[in-house]
């Protein structure tokens, strides 16, 4: 009888353990691990804790779009960070796949990593709303899923990002500062359609420039965060509209400015991303009237996401949404060897 009781107790304990794992992380009280690195988004951000696993871990990066310099730099940074002494001892295997802009293909790649027994998957989501089922599948398998950059419209998963709406707001506020009459024609060069970063920056920018009292005419084009595409669509916009008073570029800022130069368009205020080539042009063309604000998404988000995934696997208390500061440099502070190379 005692034997059967012990067996029943063991089965019950195993069932509870499995259920807890299947339910995903527990919601716990903060503060979390290393708040200097893993800063909670607000004081209302909740905290997660996963059951601790023994390392080293199998970690995957499920990337989507790979067609611009930012993504290429991000992937190189991920590989480099995985090889650092800090991470090398914690990682048994690190694999990267890029599936393009197809939502189903990216979800399938995440499912494949889950089914293959990976411990954590970091991802730049192609779509912010389509991932609820795969979050449940990751939780059921005890896999830590960490979206970053293009994050999800969900509070059920740990995420890492900069404030994209705030970044769009900063674009708009800076532009109005340099166009004090609050009127004129603005060119808005958007990013990759369907992504949360593109959506949130657009919303933040429009909220400022379309506020009561402003009388801007806004021409919107899609540059896909890519220099070549941005250069073409800006050239086409200049050919049609002839003159703009200001331009904001979510990505591909170097190409966008080159289009203005090639068209012999007067230099105007440009709020763009943090690409090195853009900053170099801002410094070189300042004498011609090019006034720039360079702020944007750091490819270093991938390293923070990898570090967060490992901390979560170790059972550390983690914020559900981790806030990363926005790097920014603006005219006249562009300096070779300091903030561009």
Each predicted region: which residue ranges?
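Short, low-complexity disordered leader/linker segments with a strong preference
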Residues: 1-56, 114-115, 136-143
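Flexible loop/hinge segments that line or gate small-molecule binding clefts
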Residues: 128-166, 276-288
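Hydrophobic alpha-helical
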Residues: 111, 115, 119-140, 205, ...
């Amino acid at each position: 009888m005692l034997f059967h009781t012990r067996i029943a107790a063991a089965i019950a304990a195993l069932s509870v353990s499995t259920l807890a794992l299947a339910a995903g992380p527990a919601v716990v009280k903060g503060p979390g691990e290393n708040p200097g690195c893993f800063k909670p988004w607000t004081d209302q951000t909740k905290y997660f804790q996963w059951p601790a696993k023994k390392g080293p871990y199998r970690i995957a990066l499920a990337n989507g779009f790979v067609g611009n310099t930012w993504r290429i730099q991000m992937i190189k940074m991920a590989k480099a960070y995985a090889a650092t002494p800090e991470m090398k001892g914690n990682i048994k295997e690190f694999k990267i796949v890029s599936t393009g802009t197809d939502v189903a293909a990216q979800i399938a790649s995440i499912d494949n990593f889950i089914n293959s027994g990976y411990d954590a998957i970091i991802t730049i989501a192609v779509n912010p709303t389509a991932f609820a089922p795969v979050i449940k599948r990751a939780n059921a398998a005890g896999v830590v899923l960490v979206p970053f950059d293009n994050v999800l419209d969900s509070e059920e998963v740990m995420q890492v990002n900069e404030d994209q709406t705030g970044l769009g707001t900063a674009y708009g506020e800076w532009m109005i500062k340099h166009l004090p009459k609050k009127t004129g024609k603005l060119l808005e060069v958007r990013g990759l359609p369907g992504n949360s970063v593109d959506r949130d920056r657009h919303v933040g920018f429009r909220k400022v420039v379309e506020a009561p009292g402003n009388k801007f005419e806004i021409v919107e084009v899609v540059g896909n965060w890519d220099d070549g595409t941005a250069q073409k669509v800006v050239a086409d916009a200049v050919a049609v509209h002839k003159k703009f008073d200001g331009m904001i570029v979510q990505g591909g800022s170097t190409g966008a400015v080159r289009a203005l130069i090639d068209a012999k368009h007067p230099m105007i205020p440009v709020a763009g991303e943090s690409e090195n080539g853009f900053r170099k042009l801002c410094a070189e063309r300042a004498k011609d009237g090019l006034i720039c604000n360079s702020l944007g998404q750091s490819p270093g988000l991938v390293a923070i996401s990898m570090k967060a995934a490992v901390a979560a696997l170790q059972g550390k208390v983690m914020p559900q949404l981790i806030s990363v500061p926005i790097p920014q440099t603006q005219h006249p502070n562009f300096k070779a060897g300091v903030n561009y190379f």
